[in-house]
């Protein structure tokens, strides 16, 4: 009986690990500052955040790549906000992504900053 329970746990472990991922939409605030415009605006949007199933092999072959999965945008739209106080001739708009859905997938370094999120600066800087 003990052997059967152990075998069942080992069989279900990968399935349960994948089921416990928590990649999904998260509400975030973004602060945008333009020195020439002399102002700072903060607005809310949605991004993708959470955990994805990943594993790291003990033996690594130089013939095989080992991509890790991250919580990435699946569907996205872009919205634009108006930057107040800008002099004429300046770009008065800031365009940003809004996540509609998320998925666990390999991070595309061509279009995404795949590094850790910088949480040290939470708003606009004062000079």
Swiss-Prot record:
InterPro entries per the UniProt record, alphabetical: Cystine-knot_cytokine, Glyco_hormone_CN, Gonadotropin_bsu, Gonadotropin_bsu_CS
GO molecular function, one term: hormone activity
Glycosylation sites (chain numbering): 27, 44
Keyword Protein biosynthesis: no
Signal peptide positions (record): 1-22
Keyword field: Disulfide bond, Glycoprotein, Hormone, Secreted, Signal
GO cellular component: cytoplasm; extracellular space
One Gene Ontology term from the biological process aspect of the record: ovulation
Disulfide bonds: 23-71, 37-86, 40-124, 48-102, 52-104, 107-114
Annotated compartments: Secreted
Family annotation (Pfam families): Cys_knot
Residue stretches spanning the membrane: none
SUPFAM superfamilies reported for this sequence: Cystine-knot cytokines
This protein's record includes keyword Signal: yes
Classification via CDD domains: GHB_like
Principal place of residence: secreted
Main function: Involved in gametogenesis and steroidogenesis.
Record-stated family: Belongs to the glycoprotein hormones subunit beta family.
Complexes and interactors: Heterodimer of an alpha and a beta chain.
Protein name from the UniProt record: Gonadotropin subunit beta-1
Gene it is expressed from: cgba
